[in-house]
Amino acid sequence: MESSFGNPALVTTRTTRGAAIGYWIATALFSLQITFTAYAQLTLPQVAEAFTHLGFPDYFRVELSWAKFIGVALLLAPVPARLKEWVYAGFAIVLGSALIAHLAVGDGPDAWGWPAATGVLWALSYYFWRRLQVAQSESE
């Protein structure tokens, strides 16, 4: 049996497979979390109250929810890499802004922990997606 160290193609294949598995796990969890929060923002009165507590107008909550739904759809769809970059950038801005908003009004970890944890899922998804992009460009 040949060592994968002697065959760079085997290392690349294993790395790509691992990155693909990591990407889909992180992206699925991230997408579920974002979809859940978007749905909650549209339907749960306590979430609407939280937006008011943060100082945001009600229409912003609705716009943000629909933007999240669209972002998740684009994240999971086979779209051009540049568009997916913009989706990741948009989610980074949303999560960073949520974290800052909660900290600015003095909320505790029970409030700002959700955007922080979702940010970790975002970072993992983006990291693995970039690894797959690099592997794809090297194979061309």
Regions found by a protein language model. Give the residues of each.
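Membrane-interface extramembranous regions
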Residues: 2-140
